[in-house]
């Protein structure tokens, strides 16, 4: 988890946030908090359409408070084509219409705080949806473009680039690379996706990518979010040169 206390342009954690043992009077709240995870799509449906939503969560927060919960952790509620349960994010600054609106999110956060609950949300920084505006721009811009440099695009191996750049597998099975068709119809570069083909990996060596996620964090901090669970934090930075994988 990444705890935050203010949406100011400063580090989102400090050494003081992490050095105190859980039983210290100076320990941050999250060290011994009871955190309840909510998958928005299936947890509580307020409008009767068969899909869980943010108003449904808001209505049931008193129940969680009465259970002794200290914080709720929401799985992704962002705009998404839902190829991977919302972990394929198309817009990090908006709510998927299936779940509600930003106003619904604000109301949920306010109600949680009124009840003494903290709100944590999932952040998915390793990859975006293939429907994200950045990836669509990368496909349109072509090889060598600044737009492609936000992701992990590479030329293929083999005489005609017909083989993937390395042997990395996808967590979901098969190879971790997909070849694109360029604007002129020719077979083109390959992009890395350590998960689904619709989840292209971002290039975390790129300063624009790092800045974008700082801005996303601050966007949600400004709306009152208390912290973040960072998805695939261990996979953000890949080995230099992307060498073949030798196994565990």
Can you say where each PLM-predicted feature lies in the sequence?
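Acidic/aromatic-lined carbohydrate-recognition and catalytic surfaces
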Residues: 2-214, 218, 222, 234-248
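Receiver (REC) domain switch/active-site residues of two-component response regulators
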Residues: 226
């Amino acid at each position: 988890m990444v705890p935050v206390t203010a949406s100011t342009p400063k580090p989102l954690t400090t050494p003081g946030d992490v050095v105190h043992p859980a039983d210290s009077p100076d320990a941050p709240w999250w060290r011994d908090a009871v955190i309840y995870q909510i998958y928005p799509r299936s947890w509580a449906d307020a409008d009767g359409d068969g899909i869980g939503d943010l108003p449904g969560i808001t209505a049931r927060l008193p129940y969680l408070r009465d259970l002794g919960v200290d914080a709720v952790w929401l799985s992704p509620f962002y705009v998404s084509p839902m190829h991977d349960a919302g972990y394929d994010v198309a817009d990090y600054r908006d709510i998927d219409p299936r779940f509600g609106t930003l106003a619904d999110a604000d109301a949920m956060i306010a109600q949680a705080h009124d009840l003494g609950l903290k709100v944590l949300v999932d952040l998915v920084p390793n990859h975006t949806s293939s429907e994200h505006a950045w990836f669509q721009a990368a496909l349109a811009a072509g090889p060598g473009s600044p737009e492609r440099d936000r992701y992990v695009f590479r030329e293929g191996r083999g005489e005609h680039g017909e083989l993937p750049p390395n042997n990395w597998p996808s967590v979901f099975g098969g190879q971790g690379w997909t070849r694109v068709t360029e604007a002129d119809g020719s077979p083109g570069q390959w992009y890395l996706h350590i998960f689904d083909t619709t989840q292209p990996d971002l290039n975390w060596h790129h300063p624009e990518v790092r800045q974008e996620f700082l801005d996303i964090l601050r966007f949600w901090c400004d709306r009152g979010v208390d912290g973040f669970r960072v998805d695939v934090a261990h996979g953000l930075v890949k080995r230099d040169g992307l060498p073949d994988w030798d196994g565990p």
